[in-house]
From Swiss-Prot:
Keyword set includes Electron transport: no
Pfam family, one: MinE
UniProt-listed Gene3D superfamilies: Cell division topological specificity factor MinE
Protein name: Cell division topological specificity factor
Gene: minE
Family: Belongs to the MinE family.
Cited InterPro entries: MinE, MinE_sf
Organism listed in the record: Shewanella amazonensis (strain ATCC BAA-1098 / SB2B)
HAMAP family xrefs: MinE
Gene Ontology BP, a term: cell division
Function: Prevents the cell division inhibition by proteins MinC and MinD at internal division sites while permitting inhibition at polar sites. This ensures cell division at the proper site by restricting the formation of a division septum at the midpoint of the long axis of the cell.
Keywords, ordered alphabetically: Cell cycle, Cell division
Source lineage: Bacteria, Pseudomonadati, Pseudomonadota, Gammaproteobacteria, Alteromonadales
Length: 85
């Protein structure tokens, strides 16, 4: 029985760590959106539409983040994973 318990405990630990990692990603994403201006979701969608005029991408391939520094400086970071040619 101890051999079976050994394999079962590994699956629980890996699924728990995977769930923790996913939750951290979701929380980080929500934190970045919390301080974003009201126009931010629409701007993100329009950026995706412009890119789609040239290359098909899904929304998961685009990451848009707005970072604000203490010096009243805002930085818009855009990461796009383009498909292979």
């Amino acid at each position: 029985m101890s051999l079976l318990d050994y394999f079962r405990s590994n699956k629980k630990a890996s699924s728990a760590s995977l769930a923790k990692e996913r939750l951290q990603i979701i929380v980080a994403h929500q934190r970045t959106e919390r301080g974003a201006p009201d126009y931010f979701p629409q701007m993100k969608q329009e950026i995706i539409e412009v890119i789609r005029k040239y290359v098909y991408i899904s929304e998961e391939q685009v990451s848009v983040q707005l970072e604000q520094n203490d010096d009243n400086l805002s930085v818009l970071e855009l990461n796009v994973t383009l498909p292979e040619r």
